[in-house]
Amino acid sequence: MKWAMIATWRMAIDGITEGSQLLKEGKRAGEAVETAIKMVEDYPFYKSVGYGGLPNENCEVELDAAYMDGDTLSIGAIGGIRDFKNPISIAKKLSEERFNCFLVGTGAEDYARKNGFERVNMLTDRAKQYYEKRKRETIEKGLSPYAGHDTVGMIALDCNKKMVAGTSTSGLFMKRRGRVGDSPVSGSGFYVDSEVGGASATGLGEDLMKGCISYEIVRLMREGYHPQEAADKAVSDLNDKLTKRRGKSGDLSVVCLNNKGKFGVATNIEGFTFSVITEEQKPTVYLCENENGKTTYEPASEEWLEAYLKRIKSPITFD
């Protein structure tokens, strides 16, 4: 197989469809990943990534992103950046640096400003409304504020056998100021090696980091595991370890792709979705189920896809 792209969640389908056009034209995986993730970041109804992303406890949007080149193993990452558009592009630029390639907070913002990245207020009116609703529910109904942590994570393989991984997220909803999860952390939120393959994770970053899960999947693929076997084993093993040692495990979901274009996916939750497109397969959204440590999936129906769009665009109401 010449090229392929896989990403976490339904929200990535339009992005990987656009990115695949570049791969068809012989463009590089990095360009495809950046283009695809920027589309997710720019869509205001995706409330866990980029513009319109859900804010922290102080109603500030802090964004994390990362980019990794599977040929050189170069990494660029940012954490807790505010008021800059398209953090994936900032991370990609940072991957060109020999030193200082992971910047956070004001340091990341200074770097973005000096390198001409667009400054934008990333907090939308809709996100503020959602914040106020959840704040009220937290106080009045005792609901957990930490709901909403859906990272877009992506891996691409191009016609030159180069592989790239990218991530972008606004992180845990109503998180403490300065909190950073797994998404920009190499080996946890992402990892890619063009000689083997790549993986990316989404879910509760605090738990995903406890298993360095993306690196573990790539390691298993290097040992000869099929991507699906590697994904299932990594998620099942970490879920079991956390349950045994801590009494419970947070949400753990992963996607992976090897350097031959074969993909895998695994989750320990209900409702995980992913998006994939290859030279041989049209862009498809899949719905996942997990039973006894094995993940299965089937294409989303047109009815499900229509209901999804209706749900994410529905007005925010206060009881």
Residue ranges and their predicted role:
Residues 1-319:
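Alpha/propeptide regions of enzymes that mature by internal proteolysis
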